[in-house]
Structure formats: C-alpha cells, structure tokens
A protein has these predicted regions:
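Beta->alpha loop/short-helix hinge microenvironment recognizer with preference
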Residues: 1-205
Length: 205
C-alpha cells in the first residue's frame, strides 16, 4: 500500500507538471472579429484519475481490465481574459504542444518513480519507458486491450501509426463496459494473474 501511494503521487505530479506547462506556454484565448487575435489566459481543468483499462480477454482466457494508472483531464474551452471578459481558447496552440506535453509527462513520471526507488529502461519515442524488472512478456500479458486493438488493425492490414483515425474508431467500437469492482478485488485479481505468469512483486526490489 505504501509503494502504491508513492506511485499514485508520482503519476499525479506528472499530470500537474504537464498541465502547468500547457497553462504557461499554450494557453491563449481568442479575441476580435473571427477570433484572429489572442491573448494569454489561464486554463481551467478537471482531472479524473483511473486505475485500469477497459476489460479485454487475455491469453489465458481471463477477462478483466489491466492495471493502467492514468488521468483523464477535461479542459474548459472558456477562459477569463485580462479585462474580465470571457473568450474561447485558441485550441490550435494547445494541439501544437501535444508532443511537448507528452514528453513532459513521461520525463516527470520517470524522475518521480526513480526518486522513490524504481529503475527505468527501454526508453522509447517521446520519453516513453518501462519499469526495470518487468519483462516484455508480463507487459504484453497485462496489455490485453492494446493487443486487442493491434490485432484488429492487423486484420485490416494497417497499424495505429499509419491509420490513427481507424485506430480511434476501433478503440471506440470494441471497448467493453467497465465493471464496478472494489480496489481490493482488483488488486487481488491482478496479483493472482501475475503469479500465474511467474511474476512476483519482489522482483522489483
């Protein structure tokens, strides 16, 4: 439980740092005819942390949502300008900062996890990484939803990188409804599945 809290705090801090970056560098409201002019404003956002992915069938036939700590953030498309009037955000600027925001999130999360004792490796594009001590086989097992989407794309003869719109459509059309389960049940199920795949939490220590 103590380690779990540290992980959750690390992820929350990475989310905050990312929002702070966008608020500082990419937050502008439209002004004037056609919204052609814009001025600096501050974002208003609501964050909703989730601990799992959508349910999917795993290689051993089990069906459950994988451990997948993430945060959904909703940014209000309104902001108060300097003269107290309200305007819509210049969303193009926000989209232009997408890659920088992703890199900030990943680098902050990596630093925070390292600070509490985790190692990181397999650093990929835009700063993505894996936790040292967790091999590719266990990552693949606990990525059933991702594999499900990947297989659907393969059947269509493409990939998410080549066909992002199709990937988004498949993601929406194949997702199962989340089942409301207590965290204790979730954690117990994940531990059982991990042990069945010869993984022990002690491997990370």
């Amino acid at each position: 439980p103590a380690t779990r809290i540290l992980i959750e705090e690390a992820q929350a801090k990475a989310t905050r740092q990312t929002l702070m970056l966008l608020d500082r560098e990419a937050s502008f409201a439209r002004r004037g005819k056609g919204g052609k002019h814009f001025e600096r404003v501050h974002l208003t956002a609501a964050c909703f942390p989730h601990s799992d992915s959508r349910p999917a069938e795993h290689k051993d036939g089990r069906v459950f949502g994988d451990p997948n700590l993430h945060t959904h953030t909703v940014i209000l498309n309104l902001a108060t300008r300097e003269d107290s009037s309200v305007g819509a955000l210049h969303s193009t600027v926000l989209r232009d900062w997408k890659m920088a925001a992703g890199a900030t999130y990943h680098s902050t999360l990596a630093a925070e996890l390292q600070a509490v004792g985790f190692g990181i490796d397999r650093i990929g594009k835009n700063g993505t990484f894996e936790i040292a001590g967790i091999d590719d086989a266990i990552i693949e097992y606990f990525s059933a939803r991702r594999c499900e989407i990947k297989n659907e794309l393969a059947d269509a003869g493409t990939t998410s990188a080549a066909s992002p719109k199709l990937a988004s459509l498949i993601t929406k059309s194949t997702r199962q409804k989340k089942h409301v389960q207590g965290q204790n049940y979730q954690f117990s199920s994940w531990l059982d599945a991990a042990k069945a795949n010869n993984f022990r939490v002690e491997q990370l220590e």
